[in-house]
Amino acid sequence: MFCMDRCVSACMAISDMADFSESGPIPTFCDSRIPGWVGSGVDAIIVSEGRDSDAARALYDALSVRGCRVHLIASNVSMLANRTDGAYVEVPSGLDSTEAVAFVLGTLCAIVSDMGLFDARSALRDSASSVAQDRLEVLEAIDGEIIGVYSTTDVRAASRRWADLIKEKIGIPSFSGELPEFDHNELVGWSDPNVHSPGLGIVVLRSCPDGSMPSIIVGHMLEVLEENGRAVTIVDIGSGTPLERDIRSMILGEAAVRRSV
């Protein structure tokens, strides 16, 4: 999947689902560079919800030359409708970012299900129904001059959506990171606020501790930050499948941003 705009978190949610389902990876690429292994026989999905149709066309042409079967989700697909041999869906105009992410996520689930990779439709329906029964905690306002948002690698879409929302709605720089890989060392490197960017606000989207190695590493990392006086906002995203936690995180992110603007 290729996406370079505000809907990238929807693509990353599909990647999280695919990893969990063990059907085979469905990676998300956030720029127009095409990996060398992408070629004949590969299904490629382009998500171009923004208005840069030239970029979508160039990427489409490059993938087609390589022999890929290209599926397109875009704001203007009319120029490609008579050329693509894959699915094509037009994103309605006038959607805000939350609506656009939801639309693209649902569309991607339909495309992935129709490919026969795994039942993404049912996974989305079940996850949405489960999260709808939650009693989510009201979060405090986000504080900081720049915000780093971290989640574990199984819910990458969660931290990316938070970072995108903060940049869009609050208007301050924000970045996302994945734990417990290299970003564990990065986060510990932020531990002393007197030395490393006192204006940095850190948000950790924490799944319910389950005794796994990632959970243990995240716990120790938070202890190090606390011992060194670095304030961290810990957001409980509960348990359940990666998609459930991704959706729950996105809802909590919307609430946190509203309290901060």
Question: Where do the PLM segments sit?
Answer:
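Active-site phosphate/pyrophosphate-binding segments
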Residues: 113-199
